[in-house]
């Protein structure tokens, strides 16, 4: 049964974990600080990396039961929990506390934190909401989880990220390893600098993407522990001393939120490209009769995206209706004010660059 397989995998994981701390002299009792320093980080990273590779392999083979088993093994492993604590105590937000005002600043606190990262009985605390000023004078809400909740998100992200990278859109560049804003701009130039390049651009703008993603869609479609995900989504937030519920969206500030947003928008590229296949036009060439593609390309960086097309009518009559439907299924809408159709001769702004 699946339960027996999980137990067998856990036993194997414990066998691999048994040498997680460097050997100390017999009968010697280590302090918490010494225990933290004695953990072999390279061995931990190697253990997690191998599990992630197995998750990728199982995902590609369509073995979803195996994927779940491996995810469970990773999120319950000592090494996975250790690396989650390492991440939240070494990143930029390590000195920023949540609503409980707790920081894991000492090695002793870190090693004790490892044992607290358990699914059983886990209940996340509300986010501490702050507002960050934007260049346009408006404010962007930022939800700050507690250290423990950040570490739990980091832990489960290790098990989710291999799937996100395996199934992600080819030309999605935001919040992904080894990809950058510059890669997205390079792809735009590659598409638009060809001799027969498309001339029309749809500049897509999603209204409050992170704040409005449907919880129901996330729970039905994100391949991770549903109970843990539900608790994060429904944890609420504290602002000006008052507690507010969260009925939609994934908070900006959570470690796992960018990946959840990316996975929500994955599939958009294939949707628009496949939608125009019926509109491919036959043409006679010196090589024989071929079908001319309508030059549809999508480039996305997080929730910012552009779509290219040969003519304006294709965007208006085919692409835009499909994108609106895609967004509506996920609880999202395009901003009518900021979503524009532009001819390449006019140029367009994307990720801080003007392309023409």
Please report, for each region that a protein language model flagged, where it lies by residue.
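Conserved phosphate-binding loops in nucleotide/dinucleotide-binding enzymes
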Residues: 141-143
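Conserved polymerase palm-domain catalytic core
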Residues: 116, 120, 135, 167-171, ...
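Non-catalytic, polymerase-adjacent accessory regions of viral genome-replication enzymes
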Residues: 1-111
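Short alpha-helix boundary/capping elements
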Residues: 75-82, 93, 160, 164, ...
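Amphipathic alpha-helical blocks
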Residues: 105-124
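Nucleotide/phosphate-binding loop and acidic/charged catalytic motifs
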Residues: 156
